[in-house]
Amino acid sequence: MTSRLLVFTRTTGYRHDSIPAAVTAVRALSRHPVEHTEDPAALEADLDDCAAVVFLSTSGEVLTPAGRDRLAAYVDGGGGFVGVHAATCTEYDWPYYGDLLGARFDRHPAFQPGRVLLEDGDHPATRHLPEVWEFTDEWYDFRTNPRDTARVLLRADETSYEGGGMGADHPLAWCRAQGEGRVFYTSLGHAAEAYGEPAFREHLRGGLAWAAR
């Protein structure tokens, strides 16, 4: 059976205008056929043929109880999961999901330029990046620091922008194990323009490839 990448973009909270550009980018970057949906029933179906499930700027409560059970079983059993940007603004009422991603969104300052610091360059999502990467985005703060349960790949230099709230240890992208599965998350990707930026595209490509089984 051909593996597919299931890209889910349902929103019941804030909706990012960048979602169409993000989906187009993932189609181009994935080595697997991409199925894009906003139908929660797609997460209730058999996911065993998925190379990975991608929550691409989802927001709010987006899954049914059956979908929650199916996704948890899939990842714990060895499936891949990728969260992009607002994926951490999703499923606040489901404790497992917070554990899955490693952190939950708290707040962000204004969209503005800043510096991304390379913490771990030995990963497909970061091998191409310089030690300091100039980027423009929403610099997400998280309710908790994911470092205790995740391998941090990138962090923010809060001295390079206004309004940061996490201090010197401010993870922006990380990966982790969940059961037998692999999870990759990047908080970057607010604006449509990001998905045409070569360094960000390679960051996303590497994360997708690493998480996919």
Task: Describe the residue ranges of each PLM region.
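Oxidoreductase and adenylate-handling cofactor-binding alpha/beta cores
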Residues: Y97-A103, F135, Y140-A150, G189, ...
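Helical hinge/lid and interdomain linker segments adjacent to catalytic or ligand-binding clefts
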Residues: L6-R10, Y14-E91
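Short, solvent-exposed loop/turn segments at secondary-structure junctions
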Residues: T12-G13, G60, T88-T90, D157-S160, ...
